[in-house]
């Protein structure tokens, strides 16, 4: 029998202590977890293999911290975010780097368009036509609420405006990091079941979301997101044989921002 356990920061201290003890005694064969796996207090009986997904979220020091917890530990690290070869060598110089350039069978490359400004008017017809065909759409904003310190469209206002505009035609949902896990799960499940056709959100959807019927994404103030975030966000669409579309709305003026987009 293979024993599998989960270690995250959400567990109670009692649950964590039980897992720590079982790991040290070799009673757990496979441990799945978050950054909690790097902690000093976590000791492994005989760590031999580490598989890291979303590697761009972890640093070199964190990888070393895990490596030091075993003897001759094998590593497999994965990321969907393209990393320039020179950067890859500096980050993973001690590892073999392989790049998969082909898409999964039947998948199409996501069509990405840059739209100058922060108005949805230039793409409104495309959005309506897409929704009319039965598709679902993500609308991503950099802020939850209006901010005096930071400029950018906020999810709360955008969701209200879209709900008013599409009233009686399509359901609009809102999800962001300030919601409880229960609230977020309720909205995400409604979106998966197509009870919500337009999901307005912040970056909480950038990982772990897979809705094959949602193949259009609109990103407001795209210049406010990093390259890895943009790749992760865009990765939410085009996850089926249907064509995916990603619209980057931006008033970017700096050359670096424009290059990134």
Residue spans for each PLM region:
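Inter-lobe coupling/hinge segments of SF2-like helicase ATPases
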Residues: 1-260
């Amino acid at each position: 029998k293979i024993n599998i356990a989960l270690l995250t920061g959400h567990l109670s201290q009692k649950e964590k202590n039980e897992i720590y003890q079982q790991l040290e005694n070799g009673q757990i064969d496979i441990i799945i977890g978050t950054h909690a796996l790097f902690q000093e207090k976590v000791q492994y009986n005989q760590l031999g293999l580490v598989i890291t997904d979303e590697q761009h979220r972890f640093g070199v020091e964190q990888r070393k911290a895990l490596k030091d917890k075993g003897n001759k530990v094998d590593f497999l690290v994965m990321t969907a975010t393209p990393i320039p070869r020179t950067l890859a060598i500096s980050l993973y110089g001690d590892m073999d780097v392989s790049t998969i350039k082909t898409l999964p069978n039947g998948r199409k490359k996501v069509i990405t368009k840059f739209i100058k400004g922060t108005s949805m008017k230039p793409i409104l017809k495309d959005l309506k036509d897409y929704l009319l065909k039965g598709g679902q759409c993500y609308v991503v904003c950099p802020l939850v609420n209006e901010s005096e310190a930071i400029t950018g469209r906020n999810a709360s206002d955008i969701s209200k405006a879209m709900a008013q505009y599409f009233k009686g035609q399509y359901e609009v949902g809102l999800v962001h990091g300030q919601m409880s896990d229960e609230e977020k799960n309720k909205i995400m499940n409604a979106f998966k079941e197509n009870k919500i056709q337009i999901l307005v959100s912040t970056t909480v959807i950038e990982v772990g979301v897979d809705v094959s019927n949602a193949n259009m994404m609109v990103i407001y103030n795209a210049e406010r997101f990093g390259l890895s975030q943009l790749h992760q966000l865009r990765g939410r669409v085009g996850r089926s044989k249907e064509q995916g579309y990603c619209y980057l709305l931006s008033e970017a003026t700096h050359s670096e921002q424009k290059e990134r987009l």
